[in-house]
C-alpha cells in the first residue's frame, strides 16, 4: 500500500484525504492518506519521519509550511521556483526529496474546465502572498496576455512581480485597479473568509470583466462573487475546483495516473455543503 499524508497547522478541516481516496478508488490504487498536524517549528522533522516510512511515496503541504517544504526539497519545478513554495513532496528514485507546486496548474485547469478562455486575456490578480505567487507562471503559460498584481501593500506586489521576472507581469495600486479593465479578476486573498471584499468593484474595474474567481470556497457564493454577479459579471467561480485540480496534479506526479475530476468536484461540493449545514 502506498502511503501519503498532508501536513499543516491547522489541518483538521482538510479535505485532502477524502479527495485522494476518491482518486485512488477511481484508478485502482491502494493507498493510505492521513492528516498530520505538525508543530509550527517541527515540520521538517515530521515530514522526514513520515517520508522515511516503508511505502511512503509523498505528501502534500499546506499553510504555514510551504516555504519550509521549498527549502527542504530539490526543486526543478518552475511554478515552485517562482512561488518559492512547495505544496507537493515526493521521494525520488535516488533518495532525494523532490518538490513541486501544483496550485497554479489547479487554478488553470479549473478555469479551463469551467469554459474560461485565458489565452490573450488581461488578468488582475488581487493579493501578493504565497497563493498569488504560485499561480503566476501557470497563468502566463496558459496564454494570459498580461497579468497585473494589486495588493494592499504595493511594495509586496512589486516584490512578487520582480520575482516573476516577466515583461507581461506588472503592478498597480489597489485603489487604481479601474485603470486596468481586466477580463479576469482572481482573488488570492483570504478576505472572503470574513465576508469582506478583496477590492472595490466600482469605478469601472468591471467594464470588460468576464470572470471573477475567488480562491476561497464555501457552500454558497462569496460576497465577492455575489457583488460581481449583481454588477453584471457573467461568470463567478469559487476555489473548490482548484482544490480538487491541484490535488489531481499531485496524485498524477506521485502515481503517473490522472484521475477524472469532473464527478469528484461535484461529490466534494456535496460534502462541503453537508458539513457547513451541520455547523
Curated annotation (Swiss-Prot):
Catalytic machinery residues: 66
UniProt key word Protein transport: no
Catalysis: reaction(s): shikimate + NADP(+) = 3-dehydroshikimate + NADPH + H(+)
One GO CC term on file: cytosol
Gene this chain is encoded by: aroE
Organism encoding this protein: Alteromonas mediterranea (strain DSM 17117 / CIP 110805 / LMG 28347 / Deep ecotype)
Binding positions (NADP(+)): 127-131, 151-156, 215, 239
One protein family per Pfam: SDH_C
Broad EC category: oxidoreductase
Family, per entry: Belongs to the shikimate dehydrogenase family.
Highest taxon of source: Bacteria
Binding site for shikimate: 14-16, 62, 87, 103, 217
An annotated GO BP: shikimate metabolic process
This protein's name: Shikimate dehydrogenase (NADP(+))
Keywords: Amino-acid biosynthesis, Aromatic amino acid biosynthesis, NADP, Oxidoreductase
MF terms in GO: NADP binding; shikimate 3-dehydrogenase (NADP+) activity
Subunit structure: Homodimer.
Pathway assigned to this chain's UniProt record: Metabolic intermediate biosynthesis; chorismate biosynthesis; chorismate from D-erythrose 4-phosphate and phosphoenolpyruvate: step 4/7
NCBIfam families, per the entry: aroE (TIGR00507), PRK00258.1-2 (NF001310)
